[in-house]
């Protein structure tokens, strides 16, 4: 039996199939952890969703920002729905859309397996969040998303503010939690997120840190696997395992076996698309980062 965590698929169906062949995935005994962003940009989002849906008894999914955006589209007017990109439009107009999208909406924001000592989240955790606190806050939003009033959440979740505070309530609280779990790359020690900084460490605004390098962050009792940050590339450091390696931007699709003492890595080539350049001018010297070799 093996447990493999897989980075952002982003509609790269062919690459996903090749990766499953590469790791010799056996649904009778193996489990897949998908780090979110199953859809968008890759051109085969419908096929990718159908594939992951077919593996639902043998996999765990956490939602990414693109998955939530797709769900948000479904509660808009038909006229607005027709304005989405062709890849997502194929999902919205598919005969099995209700089954697939209902299943997608029922997925988690965080997955924890304390037996093996791992947590999976799409983007990251706020500096002061313990793993237990992150689970609790994620569950707050999951209850809304899985409930009958989910449309209210999907209508109100967009926006860069407010920054997280325990005193928040209502829509503002849910939005802040979603932004941390699905959109964060850089933040301040107080937890304020930068949504503009998307490049590699060293290109960010002064005062911003990669979320896993923020001074004074709490110690965490679980190893974390995440995706979302394609320009960061494969990064294993300080208990963080970032595995979005830009499959949709001409990079690779990555799988990481996490249930063994020695981590195993598998990769296949993604699409041949140039990654967008982020030209934010550096305002501070980047802190040197040390990657740990897989143990």
Curated annotation (Swiss-Prot):
GO molecular function, one term: bis(5'-nucleosyl)-tetraphosphatase (symmetrical) activity
Keywords annotated in UniProt: Hydrolase
Transmembrane segments: none
Catalytic activities: P(1),P(4)-bis(5'-adenosyl) tetraphosphate + H2O = 2 ADP + 2 H(+)
InterPro entries: ApaH, Calcineurin-like_PHP_ApaH, Metallo-depent_PP-like
Renumbered residue ranges of the record's region Disordered: 271-295
Sequence ranges of Basic residues compositional bias: 277-295
Enzyme Commission numbers on file: 3.6.1.41
Xref: CDD domains: MPP_ApaH
Pfam family, any one: Metallophos
Function: Hydrolyzes diadenosine 5',5'''-P1,P4-tetraphosphate to yield ADP.
NCBIfam families in the record: apaH, PRK00166.1
HAMAP family tied to this protein: ApaH
Family: Belongs to the Ap4A hydrolase family.
Classification via PANTHER family: CYTOCHROME C5, PTHR40942
Full protein name: Bis(5'-nucleosyl)-tetraphosphatase, symmetrical
């Amino acid at each position: 039996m093996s447990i493999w965590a897989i980075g952002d698929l982003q509609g790269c169906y062919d690459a996903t199939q090749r990766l499953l062949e590469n790791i010799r995935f056996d649904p009778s005994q193996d489990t897949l952890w998908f780090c979110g962003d199953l859809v968008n940009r890759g051109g085969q989002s419908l096929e990718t969703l159908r594939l992951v849906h077919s593996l639902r008894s043998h996999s765990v999914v956490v939602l990414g920002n693109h998955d939530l955006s797709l769900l948000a589209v479904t509660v808009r007017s038909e006229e607005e729905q027709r304005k989405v990109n062709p890849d997502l439009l194929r999902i919205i107009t598919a005969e099995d859309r209700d089954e697939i999208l209902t299943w997608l909406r029922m997925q988690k924001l965080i997955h924890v397996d304390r037996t093996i000592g791992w947590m999976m989240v799409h983007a990251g955790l706020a500096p002061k969040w313990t793993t237990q606190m992150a689970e609790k806050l994620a569950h707050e939003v999951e209850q809304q998303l899985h409930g009958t009033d989910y449309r209210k959440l999907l209508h109100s979740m967009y926006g860069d503010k407010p920054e997280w505070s325990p005193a928040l309530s209502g829509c503002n609280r849910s939005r802040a939690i979603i932004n941390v779990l699905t959109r964060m790359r850089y933040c301040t020690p107080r937890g304020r997120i930068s949504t503009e900084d998307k490049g590699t460490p060293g290109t960010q605004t002064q005062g911003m840190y990669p979320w896993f390098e923020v001074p004074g962050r709490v110690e965490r009792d679980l190893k974390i696997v995440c995706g979302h940050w394609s320009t960061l590339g494969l990064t294993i450091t300080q208990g963080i395992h970032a595995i979005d390696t830009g499959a949709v931007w001409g990079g690779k699709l990555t799988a990481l076996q996490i249930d063994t003492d020695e981590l195993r890595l598998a990769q296949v080539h993604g699409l041949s698309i140039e990654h967008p350049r982020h030209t934010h001018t550096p305002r501070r010297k980047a802190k040197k980062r040390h990657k740990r070799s897989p143990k």
